[in-house]
């Protein structure tokens, strides 16, 4: 169901469903319920507005149809999306190839005359020129003390010698997303910075080494978190990773509470980080393809500490 503004685009993109262009949502729902004698309706949970949900429930009540409450459409969709087909994996790899190229490009662009915002724009422009239909999400570029904000917004702050620069970015190809984070240094770096970087790198490598089919997702999270917690407990507050596909954040997650069993064909990020408030932060992120024995790293960019 969509309105006139998106009708043509929906018909081009949606191949296995009938697209209904409505003028009045309630009337279109009513016609569908009546024509197909529908008695149970699954509602999308995360993005459906309360106003839209009220319309569905009101019309369902009029036609003795019941909105199903014990599950949601999201639940079914996320399970269907979790294991990627060969074509989906091909699209994700194509998006990551553009992302890797953007990282190589940006290393020669960064200097003390550039701001975080300018670096973010250059990454985005380069990816679009390389064939990305759009960027995967709002590009993150944070440096120096801004780096402790794990999802900080690029600012007008200029790069300074001694800064860590964290860049989190991705591309979209044929609707499929990529996601990568790299932290690089500009000029000289302190021993404390090097120690944090190596800890994050070791944590990420341990998690990737652990990732395989047939294990709980939280086992991968634990592999990374245990290494960070030895000397930096409390500085790694987000999950170790999330699935990627048609959306940038999909299910399942490499998270402490996620006991979902991994399956071959899942594409999930591995992105531990350490964030020292008011000082700096480090995050390293790759995407991995879960396989029967181990995983394939889809990210090609170097991740040893680069000092520009």
What are these regions (language model features)?
Residues 1-308:
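Active-site neighborhoods and metal-handling regions in enzymes and metal-associated proteins
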């Amino acid at each position: 169901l969509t309105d006139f503004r998106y009708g043509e685009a929906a018909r081009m993109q949606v191949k296995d469903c009938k697209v209904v262009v409505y003028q009045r949502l309630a009337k279109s729902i009513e016609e569908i319920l009546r024509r197909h004698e529908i008695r149970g309706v699954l509602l999308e949970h995360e993005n459906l507005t309360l106003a839209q949900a009220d319309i569905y429930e009101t019309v369902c009540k009029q036609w003795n149809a019941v909105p199903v409450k014990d599950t949601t459409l999201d639940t079914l969709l996320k399970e269907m999306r979790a294991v990627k087909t060969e074509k989906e994996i091909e699209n994700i790899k194509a998006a990551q190839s553009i992302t890797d190229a953007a990282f190589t490009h940006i290393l020669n662009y960064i200097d003390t005359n550039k701001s975080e915002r300018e670096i973010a724009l250059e990454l985005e422009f380069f990816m679009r020129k390389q064939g990305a239909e759009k960027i995967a999400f709002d590009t993150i570029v944070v440096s120096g003390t801004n780096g402790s904000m794990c999802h900080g917004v690029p600012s007008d702050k200029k790069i300074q010698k001694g800064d860590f620069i964290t860049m989190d970015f991705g591309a979209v190809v044929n609707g499929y997303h990529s996601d990568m984070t790299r932290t690089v240094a500009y000029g000289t770096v302190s021993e404390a910075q090097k120690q944090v970087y190596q800890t994050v790198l070791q944590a990420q490598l341990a998690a990737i080494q652990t990732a395989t089919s047939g294990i709980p997702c939280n086992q991968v999270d634990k592999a990374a978190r245990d290494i960070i917690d030895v000397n930096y407990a409390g500085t790694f507050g987000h999950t170790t990773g999330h699935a990627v596909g048609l959306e940038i954040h999909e299910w399942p997650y490499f998270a402490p509470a996620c006991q979902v069993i991994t399956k071959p064909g899942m594409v999930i990020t591995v992105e531990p980080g350490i964030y020292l408030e008011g000082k700096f932060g480090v995050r390293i992120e790759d995407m991995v393809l879960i396989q029967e024995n181990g995983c394939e790293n889809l990210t090609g960019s170097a991740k040893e500490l680069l000092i520009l």
